[in-house]
């Protein structure tokens, strides 16, 4: 293995061996599920369109999500074609339904940080919780052994 992959697997195994617990096994999958298909982020953008005070933020969020979809899921994932860590390391039990697309970059994490970035620019009262959620989403993808830290 190359040094980057060795580092990635060491981090993922550290999480699995030292942080994993039944409490996180219960809450991490539902948090990660919120990012499936980007629906929670799309819903947030659409809801914002209904209110004059948040309409511009909703449009900006929607535009960011569309750009992220194009760059992340349609361009980078097939270009980089990085297999999932659970496919690389033997004997890894995954506690969610295994994704079948490539690992890099994480669509869940990309969308969460797109939303958080727009919201931080527009109103920190919403941006800070969105940023915390984005970091939580990134952690869930590592915890579930479906993405690499790099």
Predicted feature locations:
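Residue-level signature of the transmembrane alpha-helical core
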Residues: 30, 46, 62, 131-135
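Membrane-embedded catalytic cores of phosphoryl/pyrophosphoryl-handling enzymes
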Residues: 92-150
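Hydrophobic, aromatic-rich transmembrane alpha-helices
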Residues: 41-52, 114-117, 128
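Alpha-helical transmembrane segments of multi-pass membrane proteins
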Residues: 65-74, 134-137, 141
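Transmembrane helix-loop junctions in multipass membrane proteins, especially transporters and channels
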Residues: 53, 81-86, 146, 150
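N-terminal transmembrane-helix/juxtamembrane module of multi-pass inner/ER membrane proteins
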Residues: 1-39, 73-101
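Interfacial segments of alpha-helical transmembrane regions
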Residues: 44-72
